[in-house]
Amino acid sequence: MKRLLLLAAMQSAILVGAQTRSDGHLFYEDFATKNNFSVNWTVTDANNDSKTWEYIDETSSPDADGGTGLAKYLYERNNAADDYLTTREPVTLKTGTHCLSFYYRTSTTRNKESMEVLYGKSKDFSTMK
């Protein structure tokens, strides 16, 4: 068994769906409320450009899985993103038993956007795979 800290390292604008539930998921987050975002996630602005992850309740534009709450990172044209959205508590995944799945979308189809999901045994981003 590995103790994994789930992390999304952003290189562009994305929307990710958040909330712990008792429906068989080891960890499930749909960002239904701002409290979920604050309690379950840590935001790190590693390049200190003040452009980083934030919670948005956007009823006019549903998120990737159809809800309205989302974690959003806005594209910064002049500075490559180096920002992290990490689970506050480690999530333990058992090899061959658990899998990671998530929804995300970009805000435009004009520019290619990318996202990286990292995992590791500590909160030190440089040690994550």
Language-model segment annotations:
Residues 92-96, 105-113, 123-125:
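Extended, low-complexity, turn-rich repeat/linker tracts enriched in Gly/Pro/Ser/Thr and Asp/Glu
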Residues 20-73:
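Extracellular glycan-recognition surfaces and repeat-rich motifs
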Residues 78-99:
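Short beta-strands within extracellular/lumenal beta-sheet-rich domains
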Residues 114-118:
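Beta-strand signatures of extracellular beta-sandwich domains
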Residues 128-129:
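Beta-propeller fold detector
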Residues 73-75, 104-106, 119-121:
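Short beta-strand segments enriched in hydrophobic/aromatic residues
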Residues 33, 89, 104-106:
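Hydrophobic beta-strand positions in extracellular immunoglobulin-like domains
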Residues 1-26:
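Bacterial Sec-dependent N-terminal signal peptides
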